[in-house]
């Protein structure tokens, strides 16, 4: 193998190592984003459910007490 090929393989090896490092960082960021989105979604769904419950309860109270 001549010197030029060795140099190219060395550069390719360095680029592949950098690519692997960047892919690992990207994977960690995607996992963090996924956890945050899931937590946010569950939180939002909880608020929606609570709003429906409170609204339904108020309607029921108005009907029960005849306050329309």
Curated annotation (Swiss-Prot):
A cellular-component GO term for this protein: microtubule
Signal sequence interval, chain numbering: none
GO molecular function: microtubule plus-end binding
One GO biological process term: mitotic sister chromatid biorientation
Coiled-coil residues: 3-39
Keywords: Cell cycle, Cell division, Centromere, Chromosome, Chromosome partition, Coiled coil, Cytoplasm, Cytoskeleton, Kinetochore, Microtubule, Mitosis, Nucleus
One Pfam family recorded for the sequence: DASH_Hsk3
InterPro entries (alphabetical): Hsk3, Hsk3-like
Nucleus listed as a keyword: yes
Transmembrane segments: none
Origin: domain of life: Eukaryota
Subcellular localization: Nucleus; Cytoplasm, Cytoskeleton, Spindle; Chromosome, Centromere, Kinetochore
Family statement: Belongs to the DASH complex HSK3 family.
Reported function: Component of the DASH complex that connects microtubules with kinetochores and couples microtubule depolymerisation to chromosome movement; it is involved in retrieving kinetochores to the spindle poles before their re-orientation on the spindle in early mitosis and allows microtubule depolymerization to pull chromosomes apart and resist detachment during anaphase.
Subunit structure: Component of the DASH complex consisting of ASK1, DAD1, DAD2, DAD3, DAD4, DAM1, DUO1, HSK3, SPC19 and SPC34, with a stoichiometry of one copy of each subunit per complex. Multiple DASH complexes oligomerize to form a ring that encircles spindle microtubules and organizes the rod-like NDC80 complexes of the outer kinetochore. DASH complex oligomerization strengthens microtubule attachments. On cytoplasmic microtubules, DASH complexes appear to form patches instead of rings.
Entry protein name: DASH complex subunit HSK3
Upper taxonomic lineage: Eukaryota, Fungi, Dikarya, Ascomycota, Saccharomycotina
């Amino acid at each position: 193998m001549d010197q030029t090929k060795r140099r190219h393989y060395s550069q390719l090896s360095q680029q592949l190592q950098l690519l692997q490092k960047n892919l690992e960082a990207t994977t960690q960021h995607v996992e963090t984003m996924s956890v945050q989105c899931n937590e946010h979604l569950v939180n939002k769904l909880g608020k929606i459910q609570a709003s429906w419950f409170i609204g339904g309860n108020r309607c029921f109270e108005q009907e029960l007490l005849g306050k329309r």
